[in-house]
Amino acid sequence: MPGKTPVIITCAVTGAIHTPSMSPHLPVTAGEIAAEAIAAAEAGAAIVHLHARDPEDGRPSQDPELFRRFLPQIKAACDVVINLTTGGAPTMGVEERLQPVLEFKPELASLNMGSMNFGLYEMLNRFTEFKHDWERPYLEESDDRIFRNTFRDIAHILSACAENRTRFEIECYDIGHLYTAAHF
């Protein structure tokens, strides 16, 4: 295609940064997550990046059972590439974050290239009321939380997923993460 650059569109359907009080459109239940992923594929997304949420309170979760509730629906409806998170949420340890990828062995998984600070506390002044009791502390306490992704953590994720033949979407949030990607 002369003069045209092919693109690959990825849709991150729910993520782990936002809380249910931030938007009534945040998919939380398995049905909502599946519907949004399928709609994204129908709109042209080649890849859907997926997190799970506790359907009772919208809290980010890496419980494989929650992923099991929406993955079959998506796979049955379309041939979009499934990209499961290994990032989970900033409050989770590496072993917890790995659970869905080890269980479902996706074609693609995200892989953060370094530790970072998610200063979510700055969003507090945008909201006066929260739907769930976990949301305010989740945001408030982010001023003293590190989203850990050390070289050892990254090597562990790569090693743990080697048998799966999972490929990785490399997530770089700053220039140092590019150097880490080059290292691996």
PLM regions: where:
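Conserved anion-binding
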Residues: 87-91, 99-178, 182-184
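Glycine-rich, proline-tolerant flexible connector loops at the mouths of alpha/beta enzymes
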Residues: 21, 46-69
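Active-site mouth loops of central-metabolism enzymes
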Residues: 13-34, 86-94, 143-148
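Alpha-helix-loop-beta-strand connector modules within alpha/beta enzyme cores
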Residues: 11, 59-84, 157, 161-163
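N-terminal small/glycine-rich loop or linker at the start of catalytic domains
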Residues: 1-25, 128-134
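Hydrophobic faces of well-ordered beta-strands that scaffold small-molecule active sites
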Residues: 9-13, 48-50, 80-86, 107-111, ...
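Conserved, mostly hydrophobic/aromatic
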Residues: 33, 40, 51, 109, ...
